């Protein structure tokens, strides 16, 4: 009996080891496939232009060209590009955090006529592709004489339907009794939002910060249209 139990235990350990090995092997392969483009990019940064798309791929350049990392700072105003990107990204992120959390509080904790219809209409704009209204936006910015200014991008990206939806879902999980108690104590709606809802919503704000920061930083078509 004892021998059978020991054999079953050993067999179970062997099966667990094999299953874990296969899982980790699969994950390592997937990770390697995801890292390949970054490795190719790093390798290409040390090559001449004519060697970048050579075939077969030379992963380790025979004559690494370190001068490329000097030229990128001297031949184009890269530092200016980075400063502008950081400026726009930080401002847009802060604006979206403010507008999204503020609007979400109204939709989640306040009662007013047509609230649900207005919320659904606003969220429905997520389904409209940006390409459908980028030309009207460009014309609007032109009429306001904001083209070729950072303010154009900041104004257009200061509001986010996704951000409002995300924050509203979080605020609905906060007990309404907290807001009612604050109102009884004489706190205004602005005070409730600032002193109660914002401190409680740091996890949701952190998530929205990451999404907004990455999307704004990676935006290429917007600056190409409004800043050139």
Show the residue positions of the predicted features.
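A structural signal for multi-pass alpha-helical bundles of membrane permease subunits
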Residues: 4-5, 11-15, 19-228
């Amino acid at each position: 009996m004892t021998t059978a139990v020991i054999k079953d235990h050993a067999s179970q350990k062997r099966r667990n080891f094999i299953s874990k090995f296969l899982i980790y092997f699969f994950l390592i392969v997937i990770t390697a496939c995801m890292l390949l483009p970054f490795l190719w990019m790093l390798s290409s940064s040390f090559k001449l232009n004519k060697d970048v798309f050579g075939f077969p791929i030379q992963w380790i350049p025979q004559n690494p060209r370190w001068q490329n990392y000097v030229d990128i700072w001297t031949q184009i105003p890269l530092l200016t590009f980075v400063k502008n990107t950081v400026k726009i990204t930080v401002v847009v992120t802060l604006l979206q955090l403010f507008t999204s959390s503020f609007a979400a509080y109204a939709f989640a904790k306040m009662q007013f006529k047509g609230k649900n219809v207005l919320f659904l209409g606003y969220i429905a704009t997520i389904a409209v592709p940006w390409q459908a209204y980028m030309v009207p936006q460009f014309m609007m910015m032109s009429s306001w004489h904001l083209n070729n200014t950072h303010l154009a991008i900041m104004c257009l990206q200061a509001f986010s339907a996704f951000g409002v939806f995300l924050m509203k879902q979080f605020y609905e999980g906060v007990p309404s009794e907290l807001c009612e108690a604050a109102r009884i104590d004489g706190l205004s709606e602005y005070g409730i939002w600032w002193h109660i809802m914002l401190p409680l919503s740091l996890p949701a704000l952190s998530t929205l910060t990451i999404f907004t920061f990455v999307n704004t930083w990676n935006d290429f078509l917007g600056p190409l249209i409004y800043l050139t």
